[in-house]
């Protein structure tokens, strides 16, 4: 019994020391010193070589150092752990992207999504790389799938709002942007999104001498079936409903500014 208690205490002390070294290493990396962070992580790995987050942090440090091949090699060793997470695949895919190999990056994100189908982060990265290649519809589809599976992950709303701002369906830029700002009520991204939404309002609501026009949505034909007619289930597209609401709200105004938007 005494021996078991001693072994248990030693194991607990080891893990506490490992976690302390890990925290110090992360702090060093955050302060721009990945090399010293790697030194501490190596010390920690000698105490607990099977604690995979240490190897992940080391791979991250090499990514910060722009030694992407080393980062990939380390991170791929973590695939074997049943309890590894989606961030491992995100790191590997991002490194391939930094190496100007988007095809491999997308392949890694897809592999990660098979294992972690509810990963908002992997759908985000997949969308960003697709967008950088000019595949805008695929990018938005990835962001929206990420929103569907991980609704509390704000970055997919952020990217979707940015893409829709340059489309004929700005209504979705407004909706996704507002949700993102609720999820991130402060910080640089909140400020950036506030400015984007304001620009959308300025370009989407135009006043003339005696009227106001609203343009947030491109009207498109909708398919109506006999069953829908018989059931009385014919609805206007959301964009059309949004435009009608904006038209009514802007009726008594003469300009778009912070004061009118807050009335």
Question: Residue locations for each model-derived region?
Answer:
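Canonical positions in the second alpha-helix
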Residues: 43-44, 77-78, 111-112, 145-146, ...
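TPR alpha-solenoid repeat register
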Residues: 54, 88, 122, 156, ...
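Canonical tetratricopeptide repeat
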Residues: 57-60, 87-91, 125, 159, ...
């Amino acid at each position: 019994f005494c021996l078991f208690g001693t072994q248990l205490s030693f194991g607990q002390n080891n893990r506490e020391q490992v976690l302390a070294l890990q925290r110090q290493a992360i702090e060093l990396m955050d302060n721009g010193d990945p090399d010293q962070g790697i030194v501490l992580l190596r010390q920690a790995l000698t105490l607990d070589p099977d604690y995979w987050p240490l190897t992940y942090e080391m791979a991250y440090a090499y990514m910060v150092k722009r030694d992407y091949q080393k980062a990939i090699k380390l991170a791929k060793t973590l695939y074997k752990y049943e309890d590894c997470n989606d961030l491992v695949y995100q790191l590997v895919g991002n490194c391939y992207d930094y190496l100007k190999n988007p095809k491999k990056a997308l392949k890694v994100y897809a592999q990660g999504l098979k294992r972690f189908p509810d990963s908002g982060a992997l759908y985000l990265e997949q969308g960003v790389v697709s967008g950088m290649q000019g595949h805008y519809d695929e990018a938005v589809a990835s962001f929206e799938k990420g929103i569907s599976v991980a609704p509390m992950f704000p970055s997919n709303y952020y990217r979707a709002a940015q893409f829709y701002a340059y489309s004929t369906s700005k209504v979705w830029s407004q909706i996704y942007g507002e949700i993102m700002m609720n999820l991130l009520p402060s910080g640089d991204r909140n400020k950036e999104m506030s400015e984007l939404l304001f620009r959308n309002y300025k370009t989407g609501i135009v006043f003339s001498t005696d009227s106001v026009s609203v343009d947030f949505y491109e009207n498109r034909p909708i398919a109506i079936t006999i069953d829908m007619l018989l059931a009385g289930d014919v609805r206007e597209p959301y964009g059309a409903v949004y435009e009608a609401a904006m038209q009514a709200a802007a009726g008594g105004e003469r300009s778009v500014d912070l004061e009118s938007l807050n009335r």
